[in-house]
Amino acid sequence: MLKLTALVALLLGAASATPTPSPPASDEGITKRATSFYYPNMDHVNAPRGFAPDLDGDFNYPIYQTVNAGDGNALQNAITTDGKGGSRHPQWFASQPRVVYIPPGTYTISKTLRFNTDTILMGDPTNPPIIKAAAGFSGDQTLISAQDPSTNEKGELSFAVAIKNVVLDTTAIPGGNSFTALWWGVAQAAHLQNVRITMSSSSGGNGHTGIRMGRGSTLGLADVRVERGQNGIWIDGHQQASFHNIYFFQNTIGMLISSGNTFSIFSSTFDTCGTAFPTLAGSPWIALIDAKSINSGVTFTTNQFPSFMIENLTKDNGTPVVVVRGSTLVGASSHVNTYSYGNTVGRNPTYGDVTSSNTRPSALAPGGRYPYVAPPTYGDLPISSFLNVKDPAQNGNRQVKGDNTINEADTLNAILELAASQNKVAYFPFGKYRVDSTLFIPKGSRIVGEAWATITGNGNFFKNENSPQPVVSVGRAGDVGIAQLQDLRVTTNDVLPGAILVQFNMAGNNPGDVALWNSLVTVGGTRGAQALANACTNNSNECKGAFIGIHVAKGSSPYIQNVWELGLRDHIAENFSGGTSHRRERWNFGPIRRNATCLYPIGSGHWWLYQLNLHNAANVVVSLLQAETNYHQGANTQQIPPAPWVANVGTWGDPDFSWCNGGDKRCRMGPANFINGGSNIYTYASAAWAFFSGPGQGCAQFECQQTIHWIASTPSNLQAFGLCSKDSVNTLRLGDGTFINTQNGYTGGWTPGGGDVARYTT
C-alpha cells in the first residue's frame, strides 16, 4: 500500500554487465536516408542504445526498428518481431517496448496494420511519412488498429501505444464506403502527437471515420488534424477521454458520440463541418471548452436527454449553437460564455439548463483562454542539440548502464547538469535507470525518453515515511525557469514507504515551461520489481509501497498532460511470479501561487487514500480526471483504510475517514476527488469508477462505494462540472456536509449505475 502523492551514481568500471549487442537482424538491408531528425540519428546498435533489462537475458532485443522508405509491407513485422524469429509478448506494457521509425515516404498497405501493446509508431516531423490505404484494401475496413489483438473486445486492457508525426490517408477508398483510418479502442498510456488524417469526402450520409474510439479507456488525444470524411472522431463505447487541440476540417460530422460516458474537448476547432457535435444515444457528460466554430452548422445537437456544457465558444455564422430534441435552446451567437444543461446542485428542478458568465482569473487563463502547449517534436533541432545520457562521448566520459543493477543517481545528476549547461536535450534511451537517492531535474532541462524510459527508485533513502523523499525532483524550491519532460516512466523497485515518485518544486514564467507530457507513474505489477511483488501478498496486511505518486509542492506550477498514475497493487500486468501489491498512493497538490497548474488530463487509479487531493490548492484547471477506486477496498476489504497508514491530516491533508463508523467498509474507500480548501479550482470532467468491492467481489448498482467525490472544505471559486461516478451511493459530498445522492436526481453517464453532477459552483 503506498503512501504516495501521485508521479533517475556510481562511476562504473571499464567492463559493463550489458553485452554489446549485434546489429538487429531486421535492420539488414535497410537503406539509410539522410534526415536531420534526432531519433534515427541516435546510436541504436552499440552500448548507448536502448536496452530492455527484464527479458530474462535477451540482451539483443531491439527497441528500435525501421523500414525502407515506402515499404508498407514491412511495417507489420517491424511492430511484432522480437528480433530473433518470434513475436513480442502480448499485453506487456512496460518491459518489451518497440519504436518503429518510419522514414519520409508513402507506405501503401492493403490490410490492417495492428499494434502490440507498448508500441510507438514514430514518423519524421521534418517530412511526415504517409501511411495510405490501397484502393484494393481487404479484410477489416480499418487502416490502423492500435488495439492489441490479444485483448479481443476489451480495449480497456490495451495499454501504452502512440503514433507520432504521421499522416494517415484513406483517399483511395471511395468516399461513400464505411472505412476507419484509426481504430483507437485502447486504454491509458496512449497518445497521439502531430498526426494528420485525410479522407475522401462522404457521400449520401455514409463515409470514412478518422478516429473510431470503440470500447476502451483512454485519457487524452491531442494535436490531430482530421480532414473530410463522414466523421472526424466517432466515440463508440469509450469510457472517457479528453481532447486537446483537435482541428476538424470539412467533416460531415466533427465528433459523433453513439456510446460513452465522460468527455471533455478543449482548444479545438470545427472548420466547415456540417454538424460539429451530435450525440445519438445515452447520457454522456460532455464539456466543450475554448472551442471555435468556423463556417459550420449546429454546434451541439442531440435527440436524448443530455448532460453537457459549453464555455467560451466563438462562432462565425448564423446557425444555432444548441438543439435538443428538435428545439433550439441556444440560437445563433458569436460567443457563448458559459451554458450548461444537466443535473445541477442548487437548481429547482435539479435537471435543466443554466446560463452564466464565468470570469477566469488571469493567472489561470491568460487572455481569457486556458493555455495549451503541445509537447515538442524537436524536429527543428539538429542531432548536435541532444545529449544521449548513455554515451560517454557526449556525457562527460561517464558510464551509464540503465539496466537496474546499480545506483546511477549521482552520475545522472551530473549528466543532467551538463546537458542543461550546454542547452542540450537530454535523451534517455529505453532502460531502467536505478536511483538510490533523488534524481534532480535542474532548471534549464529538456528531457525526452525513448519508449517510456524508466527511472526506478530503490533503497533505504526512500523507506522513511516520516521523512519522505522524491525519486525525481523537478527543480528545487524557489527555482523559476524551464524543465520539460516527456515520454518517461517513474516507478519503484521495492516497498518504499517514504518515496515521493515525482515532486514538482519549480515554477515557470510561462505555461508549459515546467511540463510533463505523455508519461507514467507506476508502482508494482510489472517485471523488474520482484522484491515489491513478493513483499505484498497479504490482503489483510497491506504493504506501504510508496508515499506519494506526484506531489506539486508550494510555489510550483506544472503543466501536466496525459499522465497516468497507476498503483498496480491489485493485479499483475505482466506475467511473472509474485504477489499482488497493495499500497497507499495519492496525487497531492499543495498551495500554488504562480500561474496555472494544468492537468490535461490525468489518470489516477487504484491508490489507497484518494486519487487526487487538492489540498489548499490555488489556480488549478483539470480538463479530465480518470479515477478508479482500489479494487481491494469495499465491503470485502481485508484491511480498512486508512490502515495500514496513519493519516497525516495536518501536513499532507490526508483523509482520515473520521466521518465513517469504524467498521463501515463502503464509507472507508478512497475518494476520487478529495478537495480541501483553496481557491480558483476549475474542473470540467471527472470519470470516477468503482469496479469492485474488495478482492473478488463485484459491485451492485449504486452500492459499491458510499461517496466517490468529497469536498472537505469548500474552496473560494470552485467551478466543478461533470463529476461522474459508477456504482456510488453518493456521487458528491459538499463542504457543508450535504450528500448528493446519486439516485435522487443525479443519475447519468455510466449505464447502468452511473451518477452525474453536471454542475456545482461556488
From Swiss-Prot:
Inhibited by glucose. It catalyses: Hydrolysis of (1->3)-beta-D-glucosidic linkages in (1->3)-beta-D-glucans. Residues 1-16 form the signal peptide. Its main location: secreted. CDD domains: GH55_beta13glucanase-like (cd23668). Keywords: Cleavage on pair of basic residues, Glycosidase, Hydrolase, Secreted, Signal. Residues 17-33 form a propeptide. SUPFAM superfamilies: Pectin lyase-like. Optimum temperature is 40 degrees Celsius. Inactive at 55 degrees Celsius. Does not seem to be glycosylated. It is found in: Secreted. InterPro entries: Pectin_lyas_fold (IPR012334), Pectin_lyase_fold/virulence (IPR011050), QRT3-like (IPR039279), RHGA/B-epi-like_pectate_lyase (IPR024535). It is an enzyme of class 3 (hydrolase). Its EC number is 3.2.1.39. One of its GO terms (molecular function) is glucan endo-1,3-beta-D-glucosidase activity. GO terms for cellular component: extracellular region. The C-terminal cysteine-rich region may function as a fungal cell wall binding domain. Belongs to the glycosyl hydrolase 55 family. PANTHER family: PECTATE LYASE SUPERFAMILY PROTEIN DOMAIN-CONTAINING PROTEIN-RELATED, POLYGALACTURONASE QRT3. Involved in mycoparasitism, hydrolyzes yeast and fungal cell walls. Classified as a small-oligosaccharide-producing type based its the end products: glucose, laminaribiose or laminaritetraose. This is Glucan endo-1,3-beta-glucosidase BGN13.1. It comes from Trichoderma harzianum (Hypocrea lixii). The gene is bgn13.1.
